[in-house]
Amino acid sequence: MTLSLFDQFSSPSFLGIPMILMALALPWLLIPTPTSRWLSNRVVSLQGWFIARFTNQLFLPLNVGGHKWAPLLASLMMFLLTLNMLGLMPYIFTPTTQLSLNLGLAVPLWLATVLIGMRNQPTHALGHFLPEGTPTALIPILIIIETISLFIRPLALGVRLTANLTAGHLLIHLISSAVFVLMPMMPAVAILTAVLLLLLTMLEVAVAMIQAYVFILLLSLYLQENV
Amino acid sequence: MPQLNPAPWFMIFMFTWAIFLTILPPKVMAHTFPNEPSPQGMTTPKTAPWNWPWH
């Protein structure tokens, strides 16, 4: 069967075994667990500094009650960052292009923030549905709009990550195919397209990191509203 | 779009959370930091070179 451009995103399976299990289980070999040695090596030190500085920065605007989310959000950051960055290499499947994975992370975590807000401080949480200073006549419509925007949040969170990574991989696929096709016919154009591919790859590295960060940042903002 | 095929969705969901809850937090929490955070404004001490190996 001829492959379409989207077939690179179908969840791969080999001999009936879903390969996404490998793609999800193996990247953590690159994140070594620190032992109880006082003097660690370079890799562990760099990862430790990154995790500590990142978590510090992320939790600065949160009340102390939200700080119990620190291990979860730090783990999620490492999770998404590693999967996104590894997927940029050739022939490596990116699990975060799967809508199931992204929605599966976004919906429970968003729902957790909403339920925490509703349980601990329901008045404050419900108060977000009506911004201050709203003209009286606009109150009903604005509450509807705010409710819709609340429920759109997990969808947006999941689809944003999926779409960004899928589009990036698709563009890399398209432009690299163009380079190969143009090489025998118009080498000069092929070289220009290859330069474009290089720039695009650098952009995709940035997008991989930024999209992981945006996911975590938005979750911390939703937590900030509710904790 | 093959991502919209719902067949592997539950398996991917379960496995993602299994990995995310069992493998990652121990790795992240195992990082320990020996020093208390120090207030800013202290002079940075001059470091002496060391002659023992990195690891």
Curated annotation (Swiss-Prot), chain B:
What's in the GO CC field?
Answer: mitochondrial membrane; proton-transporting ATP synthase complex
Q: Does the keyword Lipoprotein apply?
A: no
List all membrane-crossing ranges.
4-24
Q: How does it sit in the membrane?
A: Single-pass membrane protein
Report whether Ion transport shows up as a keyword of the record. Answer: yes
Q: Which UniProt keywords apply?
A: ATP synthesis, CF(0), Hydrogen ion transport, Ion transport, Membrane, Mitochondrion, Transmembrane, Transmembrane helix, Transport
Its primary localisation, in coarse terms, equals mitochondrion
Region ranges (Disordered): 34-55
Q: What's an example Gene Ontology biological process for this entry?
A: proton motive force-driven ATP synthesis
Q: Name one Pfam family in it.
A: ATP-synt_8
- Cellular location(s): Mitochondrion membrane
Q: Which GO terms describe its molecular function?
A: proton transmembrane transporter activity
Domain of life, per lineage: Eukaryota
Q: How does it assemble?
A: Component of the ATP synthase complex composed at least of ATP5F1A/subunit alpha, ATP5F1B/subunit beta, ATP5MC1/subunit c (homooctomer), MT-ATP6/subunit a, MT-ATP8/subunit 8, ATP5ME/subunit e, ATP5MF/subunit f, ATP5MG/subunit g, ATP5MK/subunit k, ATP5MJ/subunit j, ATP5F1C/subunit gamma, ATP5F1D/subunit delta, ATP5F1E/subunit epsilon, ATP5PF/subunit F6, ATP5PB/subunit b, ATP5PD/subunit d, ATP5PO/subunit OSCP.
Q: What is its biological role?
A: Subunit 8, of the mitochondrial membrane ATP synthase complex (F(1)F(0) ATP synthase or Complex V) that produces ATP from ADP in the presence of a proton gradient across the membrane which is generated by electron transport complexes of the respiratory chain. ATP synthase complex consist of a soluble F(1) head domain - the catalytic core - and a membrane F(1) domain - the membrane proton channel. These two domains are linked by a central stalk rotating inside the F(1) region and a stationary peripheral stalk.
Q: Which family does it belong to?
A: Belongs to the ATPase protein 8 family.
Per its record, how is this protein called by name? ATP synthase F(0) complex subunit 8
Species of origin: Gadus morhua (Atlantic cod)
Gene name linked to the record: mt-atp8
